[in-house]
Design a protein with these regions (language model features):
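Transmembrane beta-strand segments that form the barrel wall of outer-membrane beta-barrel proteins
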Residues: 164, 232-240, 357-363
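Amphipathic hydrophobic-ligand
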Residues: 41-49, 76-92, 105, 170-183, ...
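Outer-membrane beta-barrel translocator/pore domains, especially the C-terminal barrels
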Residues: 109, 116, 262-279, 295, ...
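Flexible, solvent-exposed coil segments and beta strand-coil junctions
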Residues: 68, 160-163, 202-204, 229-233, ...
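Elongated, acidic membrane-bridging lipid-handling scaffolds
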Residues: 113, 133-233
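Flexible beta-edge/linker motif
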Residues: 52-124, 143-167, 185-200, 261-266, ...
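N-terminal type II signal-anchor transmembrane helix
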Residues: 1-45
Length: 371
């Protein structure tokens, strides 16, 4: 009995020692491959402070971690950092470390990331960093892809604490996403799978033509998506969506084509109180929102159907909000706002964004008894 325990202890000790030593043996080889493949594929500057391999972090998978990774453009974008990440972690098959047939990547995790996407006034984006290969045929391109030592067979993709800025100077659109956390799981290596997605951003600001549509909005979503990866069509199944205090569901589908994105989506809200509508106003949502007293009825509907092509063509959309005989008051104030009646609608028949119409009729209220 004692002899068996001793042998087991020795075996475990040897195994742990190997798990500590082996990463050092493979680190130089994999670091060289990462830099070689990066230079082969990217027309950009990139580097990282260190590359580490661990057999513990995602056991029984091996983990490759790039610390302080950054990617910067060239030419006009050479001073603009596209991506800066504290850590980029890839989980690979452990046995692939001992062969030359490549490394199967089943999980990617990105932590503490800043992403700055820019579209110049002439339409050039700073994320167009892949080297062109205009001389290759489709068959040659497939062979080149197959020859890559890294095989993407993702089962899990994780984002932790990402800050993202999208600055479209041609389309006059701007988005600022703060503290985005997201998890996506599913068999991304198959033609069809069910993706399980959960994401939340602490603060989203969105402007179009200088007009703020969202300001520091808190957004959360959890959904199952029927993903037809062979045809790039994604159909929403069970899902929940929250925008500040408004909870809703989204029905429909999105299909990625080239260059269009086809869609048919509808926002479903079972019941929306006036207080939930007020959560869309940043100054109200940020100050004593829980103690705010409200009354009245409200409805919110939204739908979008058609094709979006770049910044020039938008799908048909219709967003409508109605408030009837509503009121709100802070407990600390002597008077509130009552007899609030609003009907607002934003519509576009599809096509140019300039065809968008905004109609607000009526918009009336009383403040401390005064209309």
């Amino acid at each position: 009995m004692k002899k068996g325990l001793k042998i087991t202890a020795i075996a475990l000790g040897v195994l742990l020692l190997l798990m500590l030593i082996l990463p050092f043996a493979f680190r130089g080889k994999i670091e060289s491959i990462v830099k070689t493949e990066g230079n082969k594929m990217l027309n950009a500057q990139f580097d990282f402070r260190s590359l580490d391999i661990s057999l513990f972090r995602n056991f029984p998978k091996a983990s490759i971690t790039l610390s302080d990774f950054w990617l910067r453009g060239v030419g006009e974008f050479e001073n603009d950092t596209l991506v800066q990440a504290g850590e980029v972690v890839a989980a690979i098959d452990l046995l692939s470390l001992f062969g030359d047939s490549g490394y199967d990547i089943s999980k990617i995790q990105i932590e503490n990331t800043r992403l700055h996407a820019i579209v110049l006034a002439d339409g050039r984006p700073n994320w167009d960093v892949m080297k062109p290969d205009s001389t290759s045929t489709d068959t040659e391109e497939e062979e080149t892809t197959d020859d890559s030592p890294f095989k993407i067979q993702l089962q899990r993709f994780v984002i932790k604490n990402m800050n993202l800025i999208y600055d479209d100077r041609q389309g006059n659109m701007y988005a600022d996403i703060r503290n985005l956390n997201a998890l996506c799981s599913g068999d991304l290596g198959s033609d069809r799978t069910t993706l399980k997605l959960e994401a939340e951003t602490e603060a989203l600001t969105y402007k179009m033509s200088g007009i703020p549509f969202l300001s520091n909005a808190n957004i959360y979503t959890k959904m199952d998506v029927d993903a037809d990866l062979a045809n790039n069509k994604f159909t929403l199944k069970d899902n929940e969506f929250r925008l500040n205090a408004i909870q809703a569901g989204i029905d429909g589908w999105v299909e990625l084509k080239d260059p269009a994105i086809d869609m048919d989506l509808k926002l479903n809200t079972n019941e929306v109180g006036f207080k939930e509508i007020l959560s869309l106003i940043p100054a109200i949502y940020a100050k004593d929102f829980d103690g705010l007293k409200t009354d009245g009825t409200a409805t919110l509907t939204a739908s979008v159907k058609g094709s979006m092509v770049g910044d020039s063509i938008v799908p048909q959309f219709d967003i409508a909000m109605a408030v009837k005989n509503a009121m709100f008051r802070y407990p600390s104030l002597p008077a509130g706002v009552d007899q609030i009646n609003i009907h607002a609608e934003v519509k576009n028949p599809g096509g140019a964004i300039d065809l968008t119409t905004v109609n607000i009729q009526p918009f009336s209220f009383r403040l401390a008894g005064n209309p």
